[in-house]
Design a protein with these regions (language model features):
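Domain-level signature for soluble enzymes in the chorismate/prephenate branch of the shikimate pathway
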Residues: 1-367
Length: 367
């Protein structure tokens, strides 16, 4: 390396050091402002997690970004800054389907940042219980997958527990095959969550026709089991599980269809309080008579409310009766829709607004 290029490199490093000092000073000023906000919130019941405000900050930064720093890098950096700001105001307990390493865990880590306390639960009902009892501030649950449909159990749990949707996230899902180093031909058993096995059945049958596919509670549990077993077993799940449990990634992107997305919900103990809430989810049951559902849908149509999802579920404990989960565009919690809500309640046996919240980006991101 020439003296000229060495000098230039040295000058650049001095410049970077100077910029880092400026960034550090600004980060501490931002932290002080966050603490001041937290002090104001401390005297009220205001929520720390503000999905609309965070979305507004991120979109504003991305729109102003000149482009030298890729927008996805900028978003990742600022999610951690925002996570730190929330932590300074008050530690947040966020529960998810464990153990560490599930897709819910990685979705929470990416969206809530590393400063949130991510706490694993054994099943979905434990998440709803923790949030409804105030044992956790927030919960992260998968609601539906683009290939395999709705997670019906979580729809049912919304009817049983007083929790509300705060935000939604769309994430691209990709699966890998993880082993302790054995060749695929030596694998006798493959463990994973039932949904993950369903999404990879074609690849597994084509490449491992003799292997038994065994469903377990989660993809992370599958990796955990493989780590503690012999070399004849494998797990299907997020490839980052290999780092957590000391496994080998034997094959990547083994899902049968590449366009695989999961919609996650962030749930809390009370409805979102402010900001742009451009999506609403409802859960209701109707009387057992002809046209009852049509009457409800006609009320929505008559108010120019666009419905983006309608799904029926068996009403728990009531033979041949159904409840309906609906997604709508708009904020049905707004004052302008008060009369519509009363009309809907009058036509339903049970009626619950699960939340009005900022619509997630359909483009999503890869976990």
């Amino acid at each position: 390396m020439s003296q000229s290029s060495t000098k230039n490199l040295g000058d650049l490093r001095v410049e970077i050091d100077s910029l880092d000092s400026e960034i550090l000073e600004l980060l501490n000023k931002r932290a002080a402002a966050s603490l001041a906000v937290g002090a104001i919130k401390a005297g009220s019941s205001d929520q720390i997690f503000k999905p609309f405000r965070e979305q507004e900050v991120l979109r504003g930064l991305i729109n102003r970004n000149p482009g030298t720093l890729p927008s996805e890098h900028l978003e990742a950096i600022y999610r951690e800054i925002i996570s730190s700001s929330r932590r300074l105001q008050r530690p947040e307990r966020v529960v998810y389907l464990g153990p560490e390493g599930t897709f819910s865990y990685f979705a929470g880590l990416q969206h809530m940042g590393r400063q949130a306390d991510l706490l694993p639960k054994n099943n979905f009902e434990d998440i709803f219980v923790a949030v409804s009892k105030g044992e956790a501030d927030l919960g992260i649950i998968p609601l539906e997958n683009s290939l395999k449909g709705t997670v019906g159990q979580n729809v049912d749990l919304f009817m049983r527990y007083p929790v509300y949707i705060q935000a939604e996230l769309f994430h691209s899902i990709s699966h890998g095959l993880m082993t302790k180093g054995a060749d695929i031909s030596e694998i006798k058993t493959v463990y994973s969550h039932s949904k993950a096995l369903e999404q990879c059945t074609g690849w597994l049958r084509a490449n491992m026709p003799g292997a038994e596919l065994v469903s377990v509670e989660s993809t992370a549990k599958a990796a955990q089991m493989v780590a503690g077993s012999d070399e004849t077993v494998a797990a299907v799940g997020h490839v980052k599980l290999a780092n957590i449990f000391g496994l080998h990634v034997t094959a990547e992107a083994i899902e049968d269809l590449p366009d695989n997305w999961t919609r996650f919900l962030i749930i809390g103990p009370k409805p979102g309080q402010e900001g742009k809430r451009d999506k609403t989810s409802l859960l209701f049951t109707t009387p057992d008579r002809p046209g009852a559902l049509v009457e409800v849908l006609s009320e929505l149509s008559g108010h120019d409310i666009n419905m983006t999802k309608l799904e029926s579920r068996p009403a728990l404990g009531e033979k041949w009766k159904y409840m309906f989960f609906v997604d709508l565009q708009g904020d049905l919690g707004a004052d302008e829709h008060a009369s519509l809500i009363e009309d809907l309640k009058a036509r339903c046996l049970t009626f619950k607004i699960l939340g009005s919240y900022p619509a997630g980006s359909q483009e999503g991101s890869k976990i």
